[in-house]
Regions:
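Conserved nucleotide-sensing/catalytic segment adjacent to the nucleotide-binding pocket
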Residues: 131-178
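Walker A/P-loop nucleotide-binding motif
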Residues: 86-103
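Post-Walker A helix-loop "phosphate-sensing" segment adjacent to the P-loop in P-loop NTPases
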Residues: 86, 109-119
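Interdomain "pre-motor" coupling segment immediately N-terminal to P-loop NTPase/helicase cores
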Residues: 2-43
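Short beta-strand-centered segment that lines the nucleotide-binding/catalytic pocket of NTP-utilizing
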Residues: 115-129
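Loop/turn-to-beta-strand initiation segments
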Residues: 88, 116-117, 150-153
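Pre-Walker A (pre-P-loop) alpha-helix and adjacent loop at the N terminus of AAA/AAA+ ATPase modules
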Residues: 45-90
Length: 178
């Protein structure tokens, strides 16, 4: 008796990954992403534009917060759709409470659902792990350090709120360029 009758638990059908193997990968990367629970709530299905004002315009862009949110969601979908073909970075910035983390989680969920590996850390968590791996030679931190550089997408939340020093600057530069 096989768990998957299609591939007979080999994980492959005609040299290609079976749906069961792909799902196992997705389950594993979700478990490693640090955001599994929150993605049940924070995803594109639950994204609401009615939170954003259509009236108040940003004097620099001339766009309302509603239009800015629409543009940001569009850019996120472009990023997701082109993820395999055009590797690039996304940077969300703005005031507290405008939806940056929510939108980041929407992107993370879509990529995780497509089998990509995504790891989420706050800036503080990221630099703490990196410093433990470098200075304390902590084995768990070293393993996580490697995952940071091997993942398909690294999400760094609240970047700019941490204490900036030469170590955090050099490590951020290393993460972004790897």
């Amino acid at each position: 008796v096989y768990t998957c009758p299609d591939c007979k638990d080999s994980g492959y059908i005609d040299g290609k990954k079976c749906h069961c193997f792909k799902q196992a990968i997705i389950n594993t990367v979700y478990a490693q992403s640090n955001i599994r629970q929150i993605l049940r709530i924070e995803n594109f299905d639950n994204f609401r534009y009615d939170f954003y004002s259509k009236e108040e315009k940003n004097p620099l862009t001339g766009l309302s917060s509603y239009e800015t949110a629409q543009k940001a969601v569009r850019e996120c979908h472009y990023f997701i759709d082109d993820f395999d073909h055009k590797p690039k970075n996304l940077l969300f910035y703005g005031k507290t409470g405008v939806g940056k983390t929510f939108l980041t989680n929407c992107v993370a969920k879509e990529l995780l659902d497509h089998g990509y590996s995504v790891i989420y850390f706050t800036a503080f968590q990221l630099f703490d792990i990196l410093s433990k791996g470098v200075f304390e030679k902590d084995s768990d931190a070293i393993a996580t350090h490697q995952n940071i550089f091997d993942c398909d997408l690294l999400v760094i939340d609240d970047l700019g709120t941490e204490l900036i020093n030469s170590f955090t600057s050099s490590q951020l530069f290393l993460c972004v360029n790897e």
